[in-house]
Amino acid sequence: MLTGEEAAREARIERVVHDYVLNHPEIIPQAMQKLQDQQSGQAVAANRRDIETPFGSAWAGNPKGDVTLVEYFDYNCGYCRASLPMIADLIKRDPKLRVVYRDLPILSDESRVAARASLLAAQQGKFQAFHDALYAGGPVSDASIQAAATKAGVSLSGLQSPVITAEIAKNMQTAVKLCMNGTPSWVVGDRILSGALPIEEIEKAIAAARAR
């Protein structure tokens, strides 16, 4: 129990803090953002293996890169499609970067079929070829998925494989744990980023992760 003097001192401190916050309301969103960043970092650290370990060949760049950039994407997401050349530029500009792709099919039934096909491609060592071919083929449909698979030399036998079902479920669960609210979502270091971002912002996050 606090003595009378200690209680009075605590009350004075609380009043100073209260008055400061009232006079500087801009610190509230800053404090909330800092708390959110801390919580995000803890969530990433707790799930890093599931986040950064690629499924088959669903990765690009330097396999021994010192920083891993992870993209959670949906094949029916226009912003994900628009990010494709940016990722290629990042890899060209940063020889120490590894990129891991994680299917997060949340937008449509076609998204889910496309995700299964891309994971089959990853199992067969042909992820990037399928990934590029499907994005180049216009809106996602059964026909465009088949065309991309044919172009990449991917067999679509095994779309309902339990291993692929488990991989998609794991990605969904991880996205919930990380409070992701859409695609594309990015993880680099301990940071979670959302949306179609300029390459400079991604590079800034990569540099921060590298400096840790």
Where are these regions (language model features)?
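Extracytoplasmic thiol/disulfide redox context detector
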Residues: M1-L107, V163-G182, K204, A211-R212
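Cysteine-centric redox/oxidoreductase cores and disulfide-bonded domains
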Residues: P105-R212
